[in-house]
């Protein structure tokens, strides 16, 4: 199944990139989304290797889980094509991806389609999904949930890594250079801070400033599900690096230091992990 998924991903990437190739912006965006899919699979492989829940589940299940991870952004290429062609309305790539795969028998398993449908949504939307709620088999229901957690964690790790280790991508894909941001865009809004102190991902509807935007990315740490995911982030020093970037947007070392300590305490209290063995 995973080999077929790799071919499907390539077909979607090449087919849509050919259409947008005349636009450097959209062509680069398609290139990045293909790379991102591979990076998310790499992060997912790490989680599967180190997370106890996945141990002993069998090669077939692991292959299915990896397929869901690899194809999580399969509808991004449709979105890029449609934006290039002039579409202006909203495009939910999570929902579109789930529906796209539902029409392909090989990938129509609910353990693939439902996690992809909700990987970019607030977790509460998933738990209220009628299809998820209607699953009677508790084992199947847990597998759907665990694969969703896997995709969400691997996706965050890949984005954290991109933002922190590829600064040229931080600028066009996430936020502009701090030097281009006026003082009024450096403030953190009250509603954003409220979400942060509640240990929940920042509601994007509350974001008003570039500092809000960056703290919103930091707050993703609150949405990690697996201890191995948190350990991976800390091993690469991603959390500290994100706060270093936040300092460039929000010049308040006292508050930034307090928030940095808060996330560290949260990770220790929630996961209580010891460093993972090198592998």
Predicted features along the sequence, with ranges:
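Divalent metal-dependent phosphate-bond-processing catalytic cores, especially two-metal-ion Mg2+/Mn2+ enzymes
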Residues: 28-63, 71, 80-83, 127-128, ...
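Short, amphipathic alpha-helical segments
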Residues: 88-95, 106-113, 140-144, 148-151
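Alpha-helix capping at helix-to-loop junctions
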Residues: 103-110, 118-129, 156-159, 163
């Amino acid at each position: 199944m995973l080999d077929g998924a790799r071919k499907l991903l390539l077909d979607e990437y090449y087919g849509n990139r050919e259409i947008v190739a005349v636009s450097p912006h959209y062509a680069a965006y398609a290139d990045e989304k293909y790379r991102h899919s591979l990076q998310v699979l790499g992060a997912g492989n790490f989680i599967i290797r180190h997370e106890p829940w996945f141990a002993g589940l069998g090669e077939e299940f692991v292959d299915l889980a990896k397929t869901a991870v690899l194809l999580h952004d399969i509808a991004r290429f449709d979105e890029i094509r449609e934006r290039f062609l002039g579409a202006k309305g909203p495009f939910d790539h999570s929902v579109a991806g789930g529906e796209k795969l539902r029409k392909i028998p090989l990938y129509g398993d609910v353990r693939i389609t439902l996690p992809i449908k909700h990987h970019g949504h607030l977790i509460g939307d998933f738990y209220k999904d009628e299809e998820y709620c209607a699953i009677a088999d508790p084992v199947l229901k847990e597998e759907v949930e665990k694969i969703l957690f896997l995709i969400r964690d691997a996706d965050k790790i890949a984005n954290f890594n991109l933002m922190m280790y590829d600064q040229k991508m931080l600028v066009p894909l996430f936020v502009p250079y701090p030097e281009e941001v006026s003082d009024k865009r450096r403030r953190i809004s009250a509603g954003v801070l409220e979400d942060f102190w509640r240990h929940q991902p920042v509601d994007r509807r509350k974001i008003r400033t570039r500092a809000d935007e960056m703290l919103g990315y930091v707050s993703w740490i609150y949405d990690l599900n697996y201890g191995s995911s948190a350990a991976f982030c800390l091993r690469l020093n991603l959390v500290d690096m994100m706060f270093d970037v936040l300092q460039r947007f929000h010049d308040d070392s006292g508050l930034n230091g307090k928030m940095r300590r808060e996330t560290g305490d949260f990770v220790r209290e929630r996961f209580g992990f010891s460093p993972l063995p090198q592998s």
